[in-house]
Amino acid sequence: EIHFTRTMHGIMRNITHFCSRTKSRTWGKDGWQKIVVCIIADGRQKVHPRTLNALAAMGVYQDGIAKNIVNQKPVNAHVYEYTTQVSLDPDLKFKGAEKGYKPCQIIFCLKERNEKKLNSHRWFFNAFGRALTPNVCILLDVGTKPAPTALYHLWKAFDQDSNVAGAAGEIKAGKGKGWLGLFNPLVAS
């Protein structure tokens, strides 16, 4: 759940940044209403129970209601939808409006079977993309911690030039507290 909360909390910080852009024609205080976070878990048996607990704590997931067969037909995925008012930081502390965080619209798709990453991308684009018709899609792997303004800068690349079809952000290795992560040769390189 640490990897998940690191990513989700980073997204929530970015949503707060979008909403702080009061002079923007697009964003502003209600900018969170223009953002939908889609979380796709690849396999009900594979997703870590603590990640599901984190989603439940945010109000997104309800344990015990997913069934693998309905009307004698196998279920492919379970979809949960919720607008959460709280973020769960990597230390598993709740942050909400009292800390300046904005609400976040979340769609959580729990796939019944582990069918790998490309299948999850198909779910995102074919199912949710068609339903939501977004102007911009940003894909993040779990564990990626976006900087507080990173998603805004990615969005801005699309906003400034309608010919832009893709953009990539810079990835930096987390050095850890006191830069202790640098003792790991993979991080240090």
From Swiss-Prot:
InterPro entries, per database record: Chitin_synth, Chitin_synth_fun
Top-rank taxon: Eukaryota
Pfam family, one: Chitin_synth_1
Localisation per UniProt entry: Cell membrane
BP terms from Gene Ontology: cell wall organization; chitin biosynthetic process
GO MF annotation terms: chitin synthase activity
Record keywords, A-Z: Cell membrane, Cell wall biogenesis/degradation, Glycosyltransferase, Membrane, Transferase, Transmembrane
Top-tier EC class: transferase
GO cellular component assignments: cell septum; plasma membrane
Annotated catalysed reactions: [(1->4)-N-acetyl-beta-D-glucosaminyl](n) + UDP-N-acetyl-alpha-D-glucosamine = [(1->4)-N-acetyl-beta-D-glucosaminyl](n+1) + UDP + H(+)
Keyword field contains Nucleus: no
Protein topology in the membrane: Multi-pass membrane protein
EC number: 2.4.1.16
Family affiliation: Belongs to the chitin synthase family. Class II subfamily.
Physiological role: Polymerizes chitin, a structural polymer of the cell wall and septum, by transferring the sugar moiety of UDP-GlcNAc to the non-reducing end of the growing chitin polymer.
Protein name, entry field: Chitin synthase 2
Source organism (scientific name): Ajellomyces dermatitidis
